[in-house]
Regions:
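Extracellular, disulfide-bonded carbohydrate-recognition/adhesion ectodomains
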Residues: 1-169
Length: 169
């Protein structure tokens, strides 16, 4: 039989700052919104962007487990930043490379539901961490991510480092 899986390696903590109430992990910070009402995927992305962050992109098993553990209520599955790109492939909204995936069995299935305007072009994460493509208009929880920051501008807003490498280190 297979050797038992070792827990995934944890990145060394970053030395930057997070927005208030956001949780640091590696060199990023995370927040899961999971109130009762839920948000459509476009509304969820808008909430992240309203504080100059982006829907979460996930680059390792360790990062996935960290986000799963932040989602401590059972209200919703949570939207992540994976969506159809122009070429009908899948891409992260923050333009980081799609190197790690964790689709549920049989997904993505691009199901089309008669009577619904939207095909399954947005991706949710189940409580077990698996991913499913679903109708973007469904209301769910969601997770945002930002790079840790070191300085603020004259209005006390964080100056986020640009993620030129795209790595989720």
């Amino acid at each position: 039989h297979l050797p038992s899986e070792k827990p995934p390696p944890t990145p060394s903590p970053g030395d930057g700052k997070c927005l208030p109430f956001w949780v640091p992990y590696g060199s990023y910070c995370y927040l899961v919104y999971n109130d009762k009402q839920g948000y459509s995927w476009p509304d969820a992305r808008h909430v992240c962007q309203s504080v100059r962050t982006e829907l979460v992109s996930i680059h390792s098993r360790a990062e996935l487990e960290f986000i799963r553990n932040l989602n401590y209520t059972e209200n919703h599955h949570i939207w992540i930043g994976l969506t159809r790109d122009q070429n009908f492939g899948w891409g992260w909204t923050d333009n980081t490379p799609l190197a790690f995936v964790n689709w549920a069995s049989g997904e993505p299935n691009d199901a089309f539901h008669p009577g619904e305007a939207a095909e399954e072009n947005c991706v949710e994460m189940y409580p077990d961490g698996r991913w499913n493509d679903n109708n973007c208009m469904l209301k769910k929880g969601f997770a945002c991510r930002h790079r840790q920051f070191y300085t603020t501008d004259e209005n006390k807003n964080p100056v986020f480092p640009t993620d030129s490498t795209g790595g989720g280190k």
